[in-house]
Amino acid sequence: GNYFSELNLEYETYIPDRKKEGYGPSIDGFKKLIDKKVKIIFTVDCGTLSFDAINYAKENKVDVIVLDHHQSEIKLPNAFSIVNPNRLDDKSNLQYLCAAGVSFMFLVSLNRELRKINWFSKNNINEPNLINYLDLVSLGTICDVVPLIGLNRAIVKQGLKVLKLKKNMGLKTLMDICKIETNPSIYHLGFLIGPRINAGGRVGKCSHGANLLLNKDPKNSFRLASELDQ
């Protein structure tokens, strides 16, 4: 979301209610997005085997890009693209990435392709510095309990440095509420910050965590973080 904001593109976020809709994409969820006239749907941490929902989007002329890391099967949905290091035909050797890591690598590739066609200069937009997102990527990496090897280790090492700068308003507010006064660590991500962000989904406020991480208003951040801290 923050990336699209930097590109001056409009976007919608949709977090399924896990009690009513389950964890993955659903036809009902996609219908809500399509009714809002979206042109493309990204699924994150899900979608590799969501045949029905993706077929529904295709029938409505909306492309779907899947950013996932869950195990796949030989047959895959008719999506525009399925970016998943655990596809049976994948040769990246990045099977250990979580969905946040997969999404980050997608943005790295997207940035590179946009740079090649001079998209940033043509649209008078500064190229996003993706390092600034590594606090969020490291949060996802730690909370998904994936091995801290290879690229994951590098992501978390750099991400903790970015987290220390408190550039993300939502994370900054959570750190203040958690009274994290030392240099942030893996423990802080996994046991203090992460559980609070996930808490919204367990109490019927499934969008609170995402809204907090996308929010740039201090007062709104404090309200959301306080509710997640209860």
Residue ranges and their predicted role:
Residues K31-A99, F104-S121:
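Active-site cavity-forming subdomains of large catalytic enzyme subunits
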Residues G1-I41, D45, E59-K61, N78, ...:
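Hydrophobic helix-and-loop "lid/oligomerization" segment in the mid-to-C-terminal part
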